[in-house]
From Swiss-Prot:
GO terms for molecular function: metal ion binding; metalloendopeptidase activity; peptidase activity. This is Nardilysin. Cleaves peptide substrates on the N-terminus of arginine residues in dibasic pairs. Is a critical activator of BACE1- and ADAM17-mediated pro-neuregulin ectodomain shedding, involved in the positive regulation of axonal maturation and myelination. Required for proper functioning of 2-oxoglutarate dehydrogenase (OGDH). Residues 49-103, 130-218 are annotated as: Disordered. It comes from the Eukaryota. The modification Phosphoserine is found at residues 85, 91, 93. It comes from Mus musculus (Mouse). Binds 1 zinc ion per subunit. It holds the Pfam family Peptidase_M16_M. The active site is at residue 247. Its cofactor is Zn(2+). Residues 138-209 have a biased composition (Acidic residues). SUPFAM superfamilies: LuxS/MPP-like metallohydrolase. Highly expressed in brain of early postnatal mice but expressed at a lower level in the brains of adult mice. Expression is high in cortical neurons, and lower in neurons in the striatum. Very low expression detected in the corpus callosum. Also expressed in the gray matter in spinal cord and dorsal root ganglia.
Amino acid sequence: MLRRVAVAAVCVTGRKLRCEAGRELTALGRIEARGLCEESSKPFPTLTMPGRNKAKSTCSCPDLQPNGQDLGESGRLARLGADESEEEGRSFSNVGDPEIIKSPSDPKQYRYIKLQNGLQALLISDLSNVEGKTGNATDEEEEEEEEEEEEDDDDDDDDDDDDEDSGAEIQDDDEEGFDDEEEFDDDDDDEHDDDDLENEENELEELEERVEARKKTTEKQSAAALCVGVGSFADPDDLPGLAHFLEHMVFMGSLKYPDENGFDAFLKKHGGSDNASTDCERTVFQFDVQRKYFKEALDRWAQFFIHPLMIRDAIDREVEAVDSEYQLARPSDANRKEMLFGSLARPGHPMGKFFWGNAETLKHEPKKNNIDTHARLREFWMRYYSAHYMTLVVQSKETLDTLEKWVTEIFSQIPNNGLPKPNFSHLTDPFDTPAFNKLYRVVPIRKIHALTITWALPPQQQHYRVKPLHYISWLVGHEGKGSILSYLRKKCWALALFGGNGETGFEQNSTYSVFSISITLTDEGYEHFYEVAHTVFQYLKMLQKLGPEKRVFEEIQKIEDNEFHYQEQTDPVEYVENMCENMQLYPRQDFLTGDQLLFEYKPEVIAEALNQLVPQKANLVLLSGANEGRCDLKEKWFGTQYSIEDIENSWTELWKSNFDLNPDLHLPAENKYIATDFTLKAFDCPETEYPAKIVNTAQGCLWYKKDNKFKIPKAYIRFHLISPLIQKSAANVVLFDIFVNILTHNLAEPAYEADVAQLEYKLVAGEHGLIIRVKGFNHKLPLLFQLIIDYLTEFSSTPAVFTMITEQLKKTYFNILIKPETLAKDVRLLILEYSRWSMIDKYQALMDGLSLDSLLNFVKDFKSQLFVEGLVQGNVTSTESMDFLKYVVDKLNFAPLEREMPVQFQVVELPSGHHLCKVRALNKGDANSEVTVYYQSGTRSLREYTLMELLVMHMEEPCFDFLRTKQTLGYHVYPTCRNTSGILGFSVTVGTQATKYNSETVDKKIEEFLSSFEEKIENLTEDAFNTQVTALIKLKECEDTHLGEEVDRNWNEVVTQQYLFDRLAHEIEALKSFSKSDLVSWFKAHRGPGSKMLSVHVVGYGKYELEEDGAPFGEDSNSREGMQLTYLPPSPVLAESTTPITDIRAFTATLSLFPYHKIVK
């Protein structure tokens, strides 16, 4: 798969960038941390590097001087105190700058301005779907409405606290099925095979999307993002991580708004979220909020750049947050590999710096060396946070004139120091060293075999109109016939390949651009890694001999043009973040297109880049646990074990010669899946507001809704093939995983052309059935859907493929289990959900051994008896939709189920009291612990679910302030609204480190917080209560950004068989009926003497977690193969107040079960 970034989507645990073929890839080097308060559009997890909790610190792109952004011919200089009548005179048309090229499908208007202090801004007016308004609304009308709305706004933020990473993680437990993209995606390009090889994504992963739909699709927020054209490259040598630390510190109060967490509290109160990221050469801040409060939010946010306080006391506490972030990042192979790669740069190059920062570099070492970190922070801010380095993007349902007035008034106060921006472009060829063209063996944390081949090229940003690396990566990452991966898969040497440049700062900056090819190897592939590398070099040599092909370029260009022309709108906060970075890179006319379109075919530019990809300039990194014992070096910051070897002489000599090409490697054929018909279809049945059931038989049913809102030539097809066979045993669950992964493997080559033509598909091994998801341009979508069903019908596997997939699945299960947060979830759901097979059960069943015959028998039985449920939405007729279901039924020719099957687990009813399940983490090199305190409620109504959402929303800010800001217990701290197979509850989770705290201490502090929170809500004013209710209503009231959000919400109702498509309306109605006493009574009832409380501790390894003999965990530890739960007893103090769970099966065997329950009324 090629690695090219389209529009980035962000998420809680990290950042994933969606690649051209519609799958996901993790961006190497992106330092990130996401707040859980607003779980962005799509859970695209990422690597994490330094960043505030809600911060994503990123090592991002080049920092080139933008072209054409000064005043120029049609440039516009915003003036302080501009004449109001002149401004109003322009407002009636609300027409944007014609120079800025936008998609015909984009209803927004754009205007570029430059303030007198040098700050450049892009104003985005989104007046589409404004009820009762048109694009001709005047500033006066807007301001009048604003004043009226603000009359009842209560500005008491005093009690609301900092929430950099907290936020209500309102996610349904059933949605938490494994391989939900937030929790179980691999954090490494080398490991992306797990995306397809995990079965962890159950059908309730779809429910996770419902949560996100609830939070982000219900309102199109106003949003802003600001990019400072300076990042971690500017870190002083004696204070590593200072740029990242400053990005944290500017949030901590300002001269105008001194409350330390005032901005976060203001956003939280008004349904907003914020984040920030530190990159190599850029630092980005962004937020969104309800439109009504956008102007005030802009003023509060701008103070970060006008006069932040950065008081000494806050510095000491925030260093702990940065250090916790670093500790969380240490077990990531992606981060470890990146740090190792940076260390290969020549001395003096900034890539060799430690961007993260930690307590050692920001506190202890400075103290030892008499460095005043506080003074240096302010000095760094004054030097580098200058207006003329900044690009700002604001988007709201205001006229362009209104936005210009606000931006000019507020952001003109940012100082301009008049100093030139730091420039690193003279530091070229950082990796032109003898150490680069070597073989590096690395011992990873995870179970993985991977080979990464990397070249460091001259900076490529100036070639954005040609995008030579995108052209090359499209071919190298191709998975169809004649491709590298197709050949390696046939040899059973590789499972996945990602090639190209992810456009992060680590991969592309003003000093170099990386081109890398990461290949996930099988066990056999690891043994033949030199042959694998040779295959890559043969393919590249073939491309070099052929030279650039205009046919291929034009095919890529056509695919990109189609996607741009018919693009769907994205979440505003993601969009403005992307645009403010684009403003640093592209001239004004290409702000919206520069990162996506291929403008010019220049074969000489492509050839110049292609001809540098030769073996003599390549760096080889081989990751494998098999390297243990032969790696005698250790990277300073992440402790990565590695060795450096000369490439074997026989291969060196071969690659120097005119070696033969491989006849099995060739260019891809012409793509038959590229859409050419974009006609919008007419209705062939009555229009409905919600999906209607148009087919209902014993074998299946179909829900359908024709799109008449977004009016794009795309469709979404989703099917759930339900079978009772899957959950009958742990072995069956594993066989189902193997089946889905082999099916995905079988489809990889024939379906790849569809994938790159913007037709996306995913097969998900759900808890109760196979989920098929297909979307894209409707013209050729039936071809892809039929291809999937054909391969499902004719499923087969060779012994070699079966062995390859089962071996990889062992690694996948292992990699999931060694993460404390995912093990904690597995333990919690194993306790709560009756008859659930845990990940450890599955791992053990796989280790016990399964045969190909058992798989084929399982698949035969699975296909013989099913119930199929589907949803089709978009630019398709009802007749065409029925054809999809008919095709499934006719091809599979299955019998109906003998009885209706529930698509959820029964849940155990916890006894009253406090129950504690404390287990050791399974990665003995990981200091991270996870503590979750869960309160079970029971079978509740939709009204009570909504009340619980409101409770958690109230809880977010004080939870974060108490547990992270004041107690500094950990980086990730959040309350969560839990829906576990229809049974309600709420929890508070803290990720901490055993090097700093004992898990029981954290548990007690969580209880301390909940006690203080009870007092807080009792003293809540009616105004403060109503403000929060209004904020949640607003989040549920606004329109979807694009069709996919509406589909996600509807699919969640279908896949859980709840069918309450107007759920949001019912929740809004419930919210309007709540009083403060409802909230207080509900909380007290669940915290009282009869409360049902479960604490789950996954205990890391460090000095605060000692075994009974006083030895730290992990010393003289057993082999990593021992994947058993090791229960730990509570301390004598905690034992007095808790009931320990030391055998989950024995504990749950004695408990009653709740009846199956759905939250539908």
